[in-house]
Amino acid sequence: MNLRPLQDRIIVKRVEEATMTAGGLYIPETAKEKPQQGEVVAVGNGKRGDDGKVYPIDLKVGDKVLFGKYAGSEVKLEGEDFLIMREDDILGVVEK
């Protein structure tokens, strides 16, 4: 991917949810909501504070993150869908 986010922005690829329930029922595309979990694929350098210092982002490439339903801006790059969002849009990191 040839896109580098600026400042405190992060690029996230949504994690696809299963199309079958645990009971074996198929969930059609029209009934599924977009997942609110994804993987960080790129991070910016950090946010510049009022004092002029750059404060680094607490996330790194590969982190699994949770975000709000309406967080970020959707973009399509090289045939894939991504979200560009600010660090503040991230609700938490899923620990392994």
Swiss-Prot record:
Q: What is this protein called?
A: Co-chaperonin GroES
The UniProt keyword set, sorted, is: Chaperone, Cytoplasm
- What is stated as this protein's family in its record? Belongs to the GroES chaperonin family.
Keyword match Cytoplasm: yes
Keyword Cytoplasm appears in the UniProt entry = yes
Q: Which organism is it from?
A: Geobacter sp. (strain M21)
Q: Which domain of life is it from?
A: Bacteria
> How is the quaternary structure described?
Heptamer of 7 subunits arranged in a ring. Interacts with the chaperonin GroEL.
